[in-house]
From Swiss-Prot:
This protein's encoding gene: petJ
HAMAP family in the cross-refs: Cytc_PetJ (MF_00594)
Gene3D superfamilies: Cytochrome c-like domain (1.10.760.10)
InterPro entries named among the record's database cross-references: Cyt_c-like_dom, Cyt_c-like_dom_sf, Cyt_C6, Cyt_C_IC
Signal peptide: 1-20
Top-level taxon of origin: Eukaryota
Official protein name in the record: Cytochrome c6
Length: 104
């Protein structure tokens, strides 16, 4: 039983480390590709469509899948970032959601 508990705690710790690394990578991708228009969760082109949680929810963009699709394909004034890998896109989407939940 003790070894099972040790295994579970180790697994949880390792998963948390990977998650933190993914958010850090997402922040790097965001800074390099998104911050020019979306610094601080804002939107310099369409000010009403911010990355704040209430705006993401109102625009049905409050999931990793929805944000990833937008980043990959672009829409309206936002260009496509299809040159990013799927992993990069998923990391930046997770970062955006995490920041939105924190209030940027």
């Amino acid at each position: 039983m003790k070894s099972l508990l040790t295994f579970i705690l180790t697994t949880i710790f390792c998963i948390q480390q990977v998650w933190a690394a993914d958010l850090a990578h997402g922040e790097q991708i965001f800074s390099a590709n998104c911050a020019a228009c979306h610094a601080g969760g804002n939107n310099v082109i369409m000010p009403e469509k911010t990355l704040k949680l209430d705006a993401l929810e109102a625009n049905q963009m409050n999931s990793v899948e929805a944000i990833s699709t937008q980043v990959r394909n672009g829409k309206n004034a936002m260009p496509s970032f299809s040159r990013l890998t799927d992993s990069d896109i998923e990391d930046v989407a997770n970062y955006v959601l995490a920041q939105a939940k924190k209030g940027w």
